[in-house]
A protein has these predicted regions:
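Hydrophobic alpha-helical connector segments
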Residues: 58, 72-98
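Helix-turn-helix
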Residues: 12, 16, 20-54, 58
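Amphipathic alpha-helical segments used for helix-helix packing
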Residues: 91-113, 160
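Amphipathic alpha-helical packing segments from all-alpha helical-bundle domains
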Residues: 68, 87, 94, 98, ...
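Short, basic, alpha-helical segments at the C-terminal edge of helix-turn-helix-like DNA-binding modules
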Residues: 31, 61-68
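C-terminal peripheral helix-coil segments that are non-catalytic and often amphipathic
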Residues: 94, 98, 128-132, 147-189
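N-terminal intrinsically disordered/low-complexity leader segments
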Residues: 1-6
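Alpha-helical DNA-contacting segments of helix-turn-helix folds
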Residues: 57-63, 106, 115-118
Length: 189
Protein backbone atom coordinates (compact mmCIF):
# COMPACT_ATOMS: atom_id res chain seq x y z
CA UNK A 1 0.00 0.00 0.00
CA UNK A 2 1.53 3.35 -0.96
CA UNK A 3 2.72 5.49 1.96
CA UNK A 4 0.28 8.33 1.16
CA UNK A 5 -2.68 5.96 1.34
CA UNK A 6 -1.45 4.55 4.67
CA UNK A 7 -1.18 8.04 6.12
CA UNK A 8 -4.60 8.98 4.77
CA UNK A 9 -6.19 5.90 6.36
CA UNK A 10 -4.42 6.51 9.67
CA UNK A 11 -5.59 10.13 9.59
CA UNK A 12 -9.19 9.02 8.94
CA UNK A 13 -9.00 6.64 11.89
CA UNK A 14 -7.57 9.38 14.11
CA UNK A 15 -10.25 11.91 13.13
CA UNK A 16 -13.03 9.35 13.52
CA UNK A 17 -11.75 8.29 16.93
CA UNK A 18 -11.46 11.89 18.13
CA UNK A 19 -15.04 12.54 17.03
CA UNK A 20 -16.44 9.41 18.68
CA UNK A 21 -14.42 9.78 21.90
CA UNK A 22 -15.60 13.39 22.10
CA UNK A 23 -19.24 12.37 21.65
CA UNK A 24 -19.34 9.15 23.70
CA UNK A 25 -16.29 9.07 25.95
CA UNK A 26 -13.80 6.22 26.14
CA UNK A 27 -16.02 3.70 27.93
CA UNK A 28 -18.93 3.87 25.50
CA UNK A 29 -16.77 3.94 22.36
CA UNK A 30 -16.25 0.71 20.43
CA UNK A 31 -13.63 0.15 17.76
CA UNK A 32 -16.56 -0.69 15.47
CA UNK A 33 -17.93 2.85 16.03
CA UNK A 34 -14.58 4.28 14.99
CA UNK A 35 -14.29 2.06 11.91
CA UNK A 36 -17.81 2.97 10.80
CA UNK A 37 -17.09 6.69 11.21
CA UNK A 38 -13.82 6.28 9.27
CA UNK A 39 -15.63 4.16 6.64
CA UNK A 40 -13.11 1.32 6.85
CA UNK A 41 -13.27 -2.28 8.10
CA UNK A 42 -12.71 -2.69 11.84
CA UNK A 43 -9.80 -5.07 11.15
CA UNK A 44 -7.98 -2.26 9.36
CA UNK A 45 -8.19 -0.10 12.50
CA UNK A 46 -6.26 -2.83 14.35
CA UNK A 47 -3.58 -2.71 11.65
CA UNK A 48 -2.76 0.82 12.81
CA UNK A 49 -3.64 0.66 16.52
CA UNK A 50 -3.40 -2.47 18.63
CA UNK A 51 -6.33 -1.38 20.83
CA UNK A 52 -8.63 1.45 21.79
CA UNK A 53 -6.28 2.60 24.58
CA UNK A 54 -3.40 3.14 22.14
CA UNK A 55 -5.63 5.20 19.88
CA UNK A 56 -6.93 7.21 22.85
CA UNK A 57 -3.36 7.92 23.99
CA UNK A 58 -2.39 9.22 20.57
CA UNK A 59 -5.28 11.66 20.65
CA UNK A 60 -4.59 13.07 24.11
CA UNK A 61 -0.76 13.02 24.25
CA UNK A 62 -0.34 16.51 22.70
CA UNK A 63 -2.18 17.96 25.72
CA UNK A 64 0.50 16.86 28.18
CA UNK A 65 3.19 18.00 25.77
CA UNK A 66 1.84 21.56 25.42
CA UNK A 67 1.07 21.92 29.14
CA UNK A 68 4.58 20.90 30.15
CA UNK A 69 6.14 23.06 27.44
CA UNK A 70 4.11 26.11 28.53
CA UNK A 71 5.27 25.72 32.13
CA UNK A 72 8.87 24.97 31.19
CA UNK A 73 9.15 28.00 28.90
CA UNK A 74 7.38 30.35 31.30
CA UNK A 75 9.62 29.38 34.22
CA UNK A 76 12.70 30.39 32.22
CA UNK A 77 11.36 33.93 31.74
CA UNK A 78 11.92 36.92 34.00
CA UNK A 79 9.37 39.51 35.08
CA UNK A 80 5.94 39.41 36.65
CA UNK A 81 3.74 36.34 36.33
CA UNK A 82 1.65 38.05 33.66
CA UNK A 83 4.75 39.20 31.73
CA UNK A 84 6.18 35.66 31.81
CA UNK A 85 2.87 34.20 30.66
CA UNK A 86 2.57 36.71 27.81
CA UNK A 87 6.20 36.17 26.78
CA UNK A 88 5.99 32.41 26.36
CA UNK A 89 3.25 30.56 28.23
CA UNK A 90 0.39 32.05 26.23
CA UNK A 91 1.73 30.66 22.94
CA UNK A 92 1.72 27.09 24.24
CA UNK A 93 -1.61 27.40 26.07
CA UNK A 94 -3.14 28.60 22.79
CA UNK A 95 -1.63 25.57 21.05
CA UNK A 96 -3.18 23.44 23.77
CA UNK A 97 -6.55 25.14 23.19
CA UNK A 98 -6.24 24.58 19.44
CA UNK A 99 -6.41 20.91 20.47
CA UNK A 100 -9.63 21.74 22.34
CA UNK A 101 -11.41 18.49 21.54
CA UNK A 102 -8.42 16.47 22.74
CA UNK A 103 -8.36 18.54 25.94
CA UNK A 104 -12.05 17.87 26.57
CA UNK A 105 -11.59 14.18 25.76
CA UNK A 106 -8.72 13.95 28.25
CA UNK A 107 -10.43 15.86 31.04
CA UNK A 108 -14.08 14.83 30.62
CA UNK A 109 -14.14 11.61 28.60
CA UNK A 110 -11.24 9.49 29.92
CA UNK A 111 -13.13 7.35 32.42
CA UNK A 112 -11.91 3.77 32.10
CA UNK A 113 -8.38 4.74 31.02
CA UNK A 114 -5.14 5.35 32.87
CA UNK A 115 -5.93 9.05 32.31
CA UNK A 116 -9.23 9.15 34.21
CA UNK A 117 -7.63 11.36 36.89
CA UNK A 118 -6.07 13.70 34.32
CA UNK A 119 -7.80 16.79 35.66
CA UNK A 120 -6.32 16.21 39.11
CA UNK A 121 -2.91 15.56 37.54
CA UNK A 122 -3.25 18.79 35.54
CA UNK A 123 -4.15 20.71 38.71
CA UNK A 124 -1.21 19.16 40.60
CA UNK A 125 1.19 20.18 37.79
CA UNK A 126 -0.11 23.76 37.99
CA UNK A 127 0.07 23.73 41.81
CA UNK A 128 3.74 22.74 41.63
CA UNK A 129 4.35 25.45 39.04
CA UNK A 130 2.67 28.11 41.20
CA UNK A 131 4.53 26.89 44.29
CA UNK A 132 7.90 27.14 42.49
CA UNK A 133 7.12 30.68 41.32
CA UNK A 134 5.96 31.78 44.77
CA UNK A 135 9.11 30.34 46.36
CA UNK A 136 11.30 31.94 43.68
CA UNK A 137 9.82 35.35 44.59
CA UNK A 138 10.18 34.68 48.33
CA UNK A 139 6.44 35.04 48.89
CA UNK A 140 4.91 33.29 51.87
CA UNK A 141 1.47 31.84 51.25
CA UNK A 142 -0.46 31.74 54.53
CA UNK A 143 -2.80 28.96 53.47
CA UNK A 144 -1.61 26.17 51.15
CA UNK A 145 -5.18 25.68 49.91
CA UNK A 146 -4.86 28.99 48.04
CA UNK A 147 -2.35 27.44 45.64
CA UNK A 148 -4.73 24.55 45.01
CA UNK A 149 -7.65 26.94 44.43
CA UNK A 150 -5.64 29.03 41.94
CA UNK A 151 -4.48 25.94 40.03
CA UNK A 152 -7.97 24.46 40.04
CA UNK A 153 -9.59 27.70 38.87
CA UNK A 154 -7.09 28.15 36.04
CA UNK A 155 -7.55 24.54 34.94
CA UNK A 156 -11.32 24.90 34.94
CA UNK A 157 -11.02 28.18 33.01
CA UNK A 158 -9.01 26.46 30.28
CA UNK A 159 -11.53 23.65 30.19
CA UNK A 160 -14.43 26.05 29.81
CA UNK A 161 -12.66 27.72 26.88
CA UNK A 162 -12.12 24.27 25.34
CA UNK A 163 -15.70 23.15 25.96
CA UNK A 164 -17.16 26.29 24.38
CA UNK A 165 -14.45 26.74 21.73
CA UNK A 166 -15.49 28.79 18.70
CA UNK A 167 -12.26 29.55 16.84
CA UNK A 168 -8.60 30.48 17.52
CA UNK A 169 -9.28 34.25 17.71
CA UNK A 170 -12.14 33.74 20.15
CA UNK A 171 -9.99 31.41 22.29
CA UNK A 172 -7.18 33.99 22.40
CA UNK A 173 -9.61 36.76 23.36
CA UNK A 174 -11.16 34.72 26.17
CA UNK A 175 -7.75 33.48 27.35
CA UNK A 176 -6.56 37.11 27.53
CA UNK A 177 -9.59 38.05 29.66
CA UNK A 178 -9.11 35.04 31.93
CA UNK A 179 -5.40 35.65 32.43
CA UNK A 180 -5.96 39.34 33.05
CA UNK A 181 -8.46 38.45 35.80
CA UNK A 182 -6.22 35.66 37.05
CA UNK A 183 -3.08 37.80 37.32
CA UNK A 184 -4.52 41.27 37.99
CA UNK A 185 -7.90 40.58 39.58
CA UNK A 186 -11.51 40.95 38.52
CA UNK A 187 -11.34 44.76 38.78
CA UNK A 188 -8.91 44.76 35.82
CA UNK A 189 -11.60 43.96 33.25
Amino acid sequence: MPQILKEEIKNRIYKAAAKIFYEKGFLKTKMKDISEEAKIPVGLVYTYYKNKEELFDEIINPIYYYLNLAIEKEEKEEGSALERFKATGEEYVLKLLNQHKSLVILMDKAQGTKHENAKQVFIKILENHIRRQVQKKGIIVEEEILIHILASNFTESLLEIARHYENPDWAKKILNLVTKCYYEGVNSI
